[in-house]
A protein has these predicted regions:
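Acidic, metal-coordinating helix/loop segments flanking the phosphotransfer/catalytic sites
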Residues: 39-58, 62
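Conserved beta-strand scaffold positions in the cores of enzyme catalytic domains, especially
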Residues: 37-39, 86, 109
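Non-catalytic signal-transmission and effector/linker regions of two-component phosphorelay proteins
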Residues: 1-27, 33, 75-79, 83, ...
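Short alpha-helical
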Residues: 21, 45, 68, 94, ...
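Conserved phosphotransfer microenvironments
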Residues: 56, 61-75, 93-96
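Hydrophobic/aromatic residues positioned on beta-strands within the core alpha/beta folds
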Residues: 89-91
Length: 139
């Protein structure tokens, strides 16, 4: 498990993904670590969730989110929330070079399938303020 939630509060994570199986795995893994995890199946819900939370500490977006692709969602949310930590889950076969050209430079790419351990490490690192560089997330 990742380190306990620091300081004064709960860490809030929004997961934007339409794959129910993947979402269940991600939510279960992150909740085991004490995080509060919200889920959005579509772009509108993701934008509303991030905007309505007192604080959103991390957005994890998949390749496919109903209404727009994950890259589009990230670009849209980054415009209104420039400091929001964001991770991208890739499962669509696009090359790293292609994704890196479309994503902000501080958005790491976590390729599916991935283990609970890799997800935990990525989340812990990003929640602690140490953003991995863009491209593949390397432990």
């Amino acid at each position: 498990m990742s380190s306990p939630v620091p300081g004064n509060g709960v860490r809030r994570i929004v997961v934007a993904d339409e794959d129910r199986g993947a979402v269940e795995f991600i939510i279960e893994t992150l909740r085991e670590d004490g995080h509060v995890v919200f889920h959005a199946y579509d772009v509108l819900a993701a934008v509303q969730l991030v905007g309505s939370l007192v604080s959103c500490d991390l957005l994890i977006s998949n390749t496919k989110v109903a209404g727009m692709d994950g890259v589009g969602l990230i670009v849209q949310l980054r415009a209104s929330h420039p400091t929001l930590p964001i991770a991208y889950l890739a499962n669509d076969g696009r090359s790293n070079a292609e994704l890196e050209s479309q994503l902000p430079s501080d958005v790491p790419i976590l390729r599916e399938p991935f283990t609970a351990q890799r997800l935990r490490r990525l989340a812990a690192r990003m929640l602690d303020g140490g953003r991995p560089a863009g491209g593949d997330f390397v432990e």
